[in-house]
């Protein structure tokens, strides 16, 4: 009988001392439970993913010091095995580091395993820094059980063709009683179910029980949901840790089955987990909470236009930071409707936050007047429209600089895709909460926020009004863009394509196929593709956005700017 402790922690990239403190605390909890093994996530010591910090000698020295601290702490908990993820310097040709799993006990490293499969796709770029480990299975006897070890991607390629080797097959040949997989698996819609499917199938195929340990927390644009789990070959996923929160849980393992620490029964694992909208909400809230905390911000500010994007951003910010730590600024111009100002007032009253009016009409007029005096030509058309957005962006940055608030941008994925935003205007800020949500999803999540809160936080008037930038008289988004239900289906297929969930992919293909069958629809699709390509330069200069879908702008989609490919 083994006792296994899952240490699903919210570690911070680069905070070696803080991570060590968390890990030691979790190990002591495991010790109190009488555990034989405490399992941390991939690169738990350094935090995942350190990027080019791995090339800094001072950073690696701190990692080594952190490992020494863990070894020292393990001497006090002598019978406990610690499974730790860390970058480790290696010798020989190739990259200078391994992504390593270390098992330590009583002040000694008793097993070393280097990750074999290094992902270099989507948001991952591990080959930039790490050398693959040798094609061998590592197994360690702990008590009466043989325990094998894998690191994240090593388990994702079973029956796949992305790599020439299959660590799961090597593990099967080694015939351990249990496989422990440490992971740093960022979440997106459908990712939890994908993990269950892939690792459940591998466990069943090879007849190997498996413990999968993940981290939680927001790290720049990526959010990790935890949801660590245990799999039995015949029963599938039999245990799941909490999502979006730290969780230190001890299980028993009798050689073939998992059980709770204090009883033989385990809580039933839901097949489907959170709904799509509940997932979006939880992912964004944790992403903002951790981004603000790690960057030293206690407060946020949002420009409140009276539109749905800023309304949803404010509602999510309040959930993440609290009503006393979110401020809103309304900046009406000549073209702002009275309804938009009133809607902002109602929204902020519902959310319990401060709303400060800061009219910009005189600022815009003064700037336009000076422009004409200096250059001999008046500002017209798009230049005058963009001036309003840039004045608002400047006001908000002045607020951020003066009061120390994190400025949140309010652009959605539909607008960002086609460049329907003003560079150095509404793109100003430090983080975008809804930049990976299509406009139709913004509407849906706004309604969900009201339903889940049990009251109308976002006024129905905001949700129901036609979207408008209000930079010109009687302006509507549909003056420049296709209707969002049409645009979003085209964008999904163009930007995410094969990474869409099967049902969503088939719907988008069918919709776009019917659209393309007409001359008008074909022209619309071509125009949208051109808009996406032409506006890469805007996306490159935009702040990071919280990723919720399989392919988000940022590190997960790297496209050239100065190129011709359409």
Whereabouts are the PLM-identified features?
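Enzyme catalytic cores with a strong preference for nitrogen-chemistry domains
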Residues: 1-303, 314-323, 330, 355
């Amino acid at each position: 009988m083994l006792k296994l402790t899952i240490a699903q922690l919210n570690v911070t990239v680069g905070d070696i001392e803080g991570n060590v403190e968390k890990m030691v605390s979790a190990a002591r909890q495991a010790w109190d439970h009488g555990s034989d093994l405490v399992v941390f996530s991939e690169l738990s010591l350094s935090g995942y993913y350190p990027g080019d910090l791995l090339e800094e000698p001072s950073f690696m020295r701190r990692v080594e010091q952190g490992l020494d601290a863990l070894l020292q702490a393990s001497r006090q908990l002598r019978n406990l095995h610690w499974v730790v993820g860390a970058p480790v310097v290696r010798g020989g040709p190739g990259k200078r580091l391994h992504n390593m799993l270390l098992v330590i006990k009583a002040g000694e490293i008793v097993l070393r395993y280097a990750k074999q499969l290094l992902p270099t796709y989507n948001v991952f770029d591990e080959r930039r820094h790490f050398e693959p480990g040798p094609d061998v299975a590592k197994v360690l006897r702990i008590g009466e059980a043989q325990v094998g070890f894998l690191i994240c991607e090593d388990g994702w390629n079973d029956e796949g063709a992305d790599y020439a080797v299959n660590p799961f097959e090597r593990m099967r040949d080694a015939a351990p009683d249990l496989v422990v997989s440490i992971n740093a698996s960022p979440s997106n819609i459908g990712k939890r179910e994908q993990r269950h499917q892939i690792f459940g199938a591998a466990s069943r195929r090879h007849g190997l029980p498996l413990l999968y340990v993940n981290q939680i927390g927001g790290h720049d644009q990526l959010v990790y949901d935890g949801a660590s789990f245990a799999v039995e070959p015949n029963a599938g996923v039999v245990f799941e840790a909490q999502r979006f929160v730290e969780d230190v849980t001890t299980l028993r393992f009798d050689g073939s089955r998992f059980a709770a620490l204090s009883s033989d029964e385990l809580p039933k694992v839901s097949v489907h987990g959170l709904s799509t909208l509940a997932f979006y909400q939880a992912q964004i809230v944790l992403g903002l909470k951790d981004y603000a905390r790690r960057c030293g911000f206690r407060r946020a500010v949002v420009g409140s236009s009276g539109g749905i994007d800023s309304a949803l951003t404010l509602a999510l910010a309040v959930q993440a930071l609290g009503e006393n730590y979110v401020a809103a600024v309304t900046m009406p111009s000549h073209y702002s409707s009275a309804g938009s100002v009133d809607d902002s007032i109602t929204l902020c009253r519902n959310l319990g936050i401060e709303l400060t009016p800061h009219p910009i009409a005189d600022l815009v007029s003064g700037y336009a007047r000076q422009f004409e005096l200096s250059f001999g030509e008046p500002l017209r058309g798009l230049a005058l429209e963009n001036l309003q957005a840039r004045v608002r962006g400047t006001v908000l940055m002045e607020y951020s600089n003066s009061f120390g608030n994190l400025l949140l941008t309010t652009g959605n994925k539909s607008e960002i895709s086609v460049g329907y935003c003003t560079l150095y205007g509404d793109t100003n800020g430090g983080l975008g909460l809804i930049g990976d949500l299509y406009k139709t999803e913004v509407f849906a999540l706004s309604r969900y926020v009201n339903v889940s809160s049990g009251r109308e936080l976002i006024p129905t008037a905001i949700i129901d009004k036609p979207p408008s930038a209000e930079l010109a008289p009687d302006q509507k988004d549909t003056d420049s863009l296709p209707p969002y239900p049409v645009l979003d289906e085209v964008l999904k297929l163009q930007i995410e394509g094969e990474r869409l969930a099967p049902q969503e992919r088939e719907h988008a293909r069918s919709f776009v196929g019917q659209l393309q069958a007409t001359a008008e629809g074909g022209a619309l699709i071509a125009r949208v593709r051109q808009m996406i390509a032409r506006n890469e330069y805007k996306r490159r200069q935009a702040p990071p956005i919280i990723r919720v879908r399989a392919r988000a702008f940022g590190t997960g989609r790297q496209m050239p700017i100065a190129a011709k490919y359409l």
